[in-house]
Amino acid sequence: MVVTTSDVVMCQMRHSDVQGVYRVYGSWMAENFQDQVSISNQIMSKFAPSMPHAVRSDVINNRLHNLYLHAHYFLICRHQLITHLNPHLHRN
């Protein structure tokens, strides 16, 4: 594992993330900033893609339809529970 200067500073100064190190100390070490960004990007590229994956519209529509069905089912169950708990709401 490659340890960058910002990682060391983050641990020593008890920052919660590397971005905090760049915000606080970035103006003091401007000449090293681009090198640290390159190293961090190289490390991060091993864990995550550089661009988000596209989601097909049919997948989105399917999920929205499922959400609609769940919401509709919830409203039906809610109505049944309310009418069960309040017998005077029953109509013949």
UniProtKB/Swiss-Prot annotation:
Keywords: DNA integration, DNA recombination, Viral genome integration, Virus entry into host cell. It comes from the Bacteria. One of its GO terms (biological process) is viral genome integration into host DNA. Belongs to the 'phage' integrase family. This is Putative lambdoid prophage defective integrase. It comes from Escherichia coli O157:H7. The lineage of its organism: Bacteria, Pseudomonadati, Pseudomonadota, Gammaproteobacteria, Enterobacterales.
